[in-house]
């Protein structure tokens, strides 16, 4: 199973398809220019991942995602959009998306996100995930209230740990030592009143930052 790109701009589809094909060792990449075309293509051949834009002619990317997930709950959708307002990010996740990227994301981040979502994980671009953690979600439980007591760096470490990022990679990406990451983990468990990594993941899901894999 390959990837289906859903975007109404042919040049964006062409460039992204070429980039992903090279970066993912020739994984097949198909294209759709509208929500209706995406629904038809998925019906004909199930992809491993749908990369979705918000703005589409006809039915929107959000509505397309809802329809796809209603028909195929196991289908994984990653939003790739120039619109990064937190309300829209939450709408995408509520519609069933497994991740969200801005079109301004670095190429390496795009590849990482696609690989992680294909592997069954959730992925929200780091700046967006941090903003989501800091802003309460109407109707959510107490997850966000606890997170608001964290510093910016603690939120970054928390989100990376919750997404399953190895300690070594967290240290590299944040330019700190592995020992410092371990210290942050101990501090986070104390501040958030959890005792295990599984509870950290549960808290991230409760706060609306991660979705349970379908």
Swiss-Prot record:
Induction (free text): Up-regulated by AgmR but the exaE promoter is down-regulated in the presence of a combination of glucose and ethanol.
Binding region for DNA: 167-186
Domain Response regulatory: start-end pairs: 2-118
Keywords: DNA-binding, Phosphoprotein, Transcription, Transcription regulation
InterPro entries the UniProt entry points to: CheY-like_superfamily, Sig_transdc_resp-reg_C-effctor, Sig_transdc_resp-reg_receiver, Tscrpt_reg_LuxR_C, WalR-like
CDD domains attached to this UniProt entry: LuxR_C_like (cd06170), REC_NarL-like (cd17535)
Start and end residues of each HTH luxR-type domain: 143-208
Residue positions, PTM 4-aspartylphosphate: 53
One Pfam family, short name: GerE
GO BP: phosphorelay signal transduction system; regulation of DNA-templated transcription
MF annotations from Gene Ontology: DNA binding
Free-text function comment from the UniProt entry: Positive regulator of the expression of the gene qedA and the activity of ADH I but does not affect the activities of ADH IIB or ADH IIG.
Stated name of the protein: Transcriptional activator protein ExaE
Organism field: Pseudomonas putida
Organism placement in taxonomy: Bacteria, Pseudomonadati, Pseudomonadota, Gammaproteobacteria, Pseudomonadales
